[in-house]
């Protein structure tokens, strides 16, 4: 059963905490926060910033943030009349390690492939992807990241034991950027990590693992930041992945183009832009 949406009691608890801590503003980032919850907070003279990638309800607050590429198609739902919508990659909030411009270098030959499938790997694709890569007749090492909620480690280790390639296994590392900078090519689920890879400039094959990712992934393909999208729920996802990876392994110019377009799209400054606008809204309120 899905958790219940936050109610009036939850908003009262939040308000009491804000008063106790002498806060001037509140940032709300949860699928459980509905319009009523946000309204209760905003009506108590606290500047409220809602972070939402679903656009599932109206927004009675001062700031709404969605950094996805297709965010402008989703939002027109202010009920207070004064909502500032911070939409698109310009406001995509990345970890601090991605704030500075990357020193990524696109090499003519792929020597390192990174595989990262999000926190849970919902289709348990990691073992099969590693086996698929091991079948390719290229000389590269593989860095595989298993998320904190994935249940594939045992099967992954079985693949590693039989692999012809060197496969390094990482379990929920705190810092991803270093592994991204080492990679010449990545395979990634279509969540936040994909945007981090684009910001770094690492050419990536994307796997759709949730329906709400489809439009933004299609938009990234249209921009040239991605070459193709593979559907994690499709029975043919592995042949599709193999075809895409093989194509990119042999096309240095395309990898260079994808790297440049990704870095042009994302400069890593989204969190700072949002923070500065939140501060100025609090100051002017």
Task: Kindly give the residue locations of the regions a language model identified.
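A nucleotide-sugar donor-handling region in carbohydrate enzymes
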Residues: 60-123, 153-154
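Acidic donor-binding loop of glycosyltransferase active sites
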Residues: 181-192
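C-terminal "capping" alpha-helix adjacent to the active site of nucleotide-linked donor transferases
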Residues: 228, 236-253
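C-terminal alpha-helical cap of glycosyltransferases
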Residues: 267-285
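Catalytic binding pocket for nucleotide-activated donors in carbohydrate/polymer assembly enzymes
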Residues: 194-239
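Donor-nucleotide binding loops and adjacent catalytic segments primarily
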Residues: 108-183
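Active-site and donor-binding regions of nucleotide-sugar-utilizing enzymes
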Residues: 1-79, 85
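A short, well-ordered alpha-helix in the C-terminal region of glycosyltransferases
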Residues: 247, 254-268
């Amino acid at each position: 059963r899905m958790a219940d949406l936050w109610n009036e009691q939850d908003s009262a608890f939040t308000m009491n905490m804000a008063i106790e801590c002498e806060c001037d503003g509140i940032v709300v980032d949860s699928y459980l926060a509905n319009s009523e919850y946000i309204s209760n907070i905003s009506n108590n003279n606290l500047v409220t910033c809602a972070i939402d990638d679903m656009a599932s309800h109206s927004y009675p607050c001062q700031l709404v943030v969605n950094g996805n590429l297709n965010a402008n198609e989703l939002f027109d739902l202010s009920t207070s009349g004064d909502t500032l919508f911070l939409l698109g990659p310009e406001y995509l909030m990345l970890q601090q390690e991605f704030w500075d411009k990357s020193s990524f270098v696109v090499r003519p030959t792929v020597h390192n492939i990174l595989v990262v499938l999000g926190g849970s790997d919902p289709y348990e694709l990691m073992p099969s992807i590693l086996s698929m890569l091991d079948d390719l007749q290229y000389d590269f090492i593989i860095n595989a990241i298993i998320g904190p909620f994935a249940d594939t480690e045992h099967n992954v280790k079985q693949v590693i034991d039989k692999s012809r390639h060197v496969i390094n296994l990482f379990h929920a590392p705190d810092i991803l950027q270093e592994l991204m900078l080492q990679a010449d090519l990545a395979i990634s689920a279509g969540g936040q990590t994909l945007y981090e890879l684009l910001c770094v400039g690492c050419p990536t094959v994307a796997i759709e693992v949730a329906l709400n990712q489809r439009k933004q992934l299609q938009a990234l393909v249209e921009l040239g930041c991605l070459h193709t999208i593979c559907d994690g729920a499709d029975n043919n996802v592995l042949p599709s992945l193999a075809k895409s990876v093989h194509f990119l392994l042999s096309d240095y110019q395309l990898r260079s183009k994808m790297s440049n377009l990704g870095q042009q799209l994302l400069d890593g400054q989204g969190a700072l832009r949002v923070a500065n606008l939140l501060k100025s809204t609090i100051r002017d309120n």
